[in-house]
Structures are given as C-alpha cells and as structure tokens.
Amino acid sequence: QNRQCCESNLEPLFSGYIETLRREAECAEADSGRLSSELNSLQEVLEGYKRRYEEEVALRATAENEFVALKKDVDCAYLRKSDLEANVEALIQETDFLRRLYEEEIRVL
C-alpha cells in the first residue's frame, strides 16, 4: 500500500511536468517557425544590401576611371595652353622686334 501511495502522489506531479514540457515544446516550435521566417526576411534584406554595395563599388570604379581620363585631358589642355602662351609671348617679342626694326629703318631713310 505504501508503494501505491507513492505512485499515486508522483503521477500527478509527473503529468504536470510532462504537460509543462509539451507546452514549452509547442512554444519552441512556434518560435522556430517565426524565427525561421524572420531569418529568411533578414537574409533577403542582406542580399539586397550586398547587391547595392556591389553596385556602389562598380560605380565608384567607373567614377575613378572617368576621373583619371578627365585628369589626363586637363593635363593635356594645360600643357597645350602653356605652349600657346609661350607662342604668344614669342610672337609678341618678334612683333616688337620687327616694329622697332621697321621704325629704325624709317628713321634712317
């Protein structure tokens, strides 16, 4: 009888414990589905950010290449301008020389 008394006292205790574990398992299963859905959503967002980052990297590379090309063009234009300014200065000096020479010849005549 003592054994039967212990079994009957423990059975409700274990039944309650089992029920609690079942509820926790159901909650864990529900959380698993929710978390799986959230994970998928976050992975999609991450993929979007990765694509955008790669696009921005490509745009930056393109911009850097364009900058290098423009810098070459500007450097060439600056050198051309310097050459033209030197030519203008040389022509001004030649014109002044020829004018003075002409004036001297006129004076001599």
UniProtKB/Swiss-Prot annotation:
GO CC terms in record: extracellular space; keratin filament
The entry's keywords: Coiled coil, Intermediate filament, Keratin
One of the record's GO molecular function terms: structural constituent of skin epidermis
Region (Linker 1) location: 1-10
Entry's Gene Ontology BP terms: intermediate filament organization; keratinization
PROSITE patterns the UniProt entry points to: IF_ROD_2
InterPro entries per UniProt: IF_rod_dom, Keratin_II
UniProt xrefs under Pfam families: Filament
Region described as Coil 1B: 11-109
Keyword Coiled coil: yes
Domain IF rod: 1-109
Other observations noted: There are two types of cytoskeletal and microfibrillar keratin: I (acidic; 40-55 kDa) and II (neutral to basic; 56-70 kDa).
Function of the protein: Wool microfibrillar keratin.
Family from the record: Belongs to the intermediate filament family.
Protein name (Swiss-Prot/TrEMBL): Keratin, type II microfibrillar
